[in-house]
């Protein structure tokens, strides 16, 4: 049994295709959209209402409150566990979403460093005090490739990159 992946931008018909395919082959659907993990984040995410899911089981929808932070590392663990359980039951699996990193986390052998909330808070505080330009310059000095991939305006990702550098050396 294999895993089928349907990915693409929001509101491009992924869900309709997944539902039709799931009905045809008896599959269950695993969400791979980072915003659809959140309860109440329905507008703007094109999340299907329960009544639109045609009785097909959907996994990893509405699993976080809006005040909780999504973690791709935790998503990877949860999604792989669900997929493994379904495959053990000989259930076809359809992964549907538009968050490329989440899909890669399922399919590829990505390793995610641990987090250190105290360290992240310290670096985030520095970011608030020093500003995004200084923090991005610090990242560029320590990891030019990461700095090239992360816009300076995305302070949350800059802070996470600096945290990973400090944790992993």
Residue spans for each PLM region:
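Phosphate/pyrophosphate-binding catalytic cores of soluble transferases and nucleic-acid-acting enzymes
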Residues: 1-169
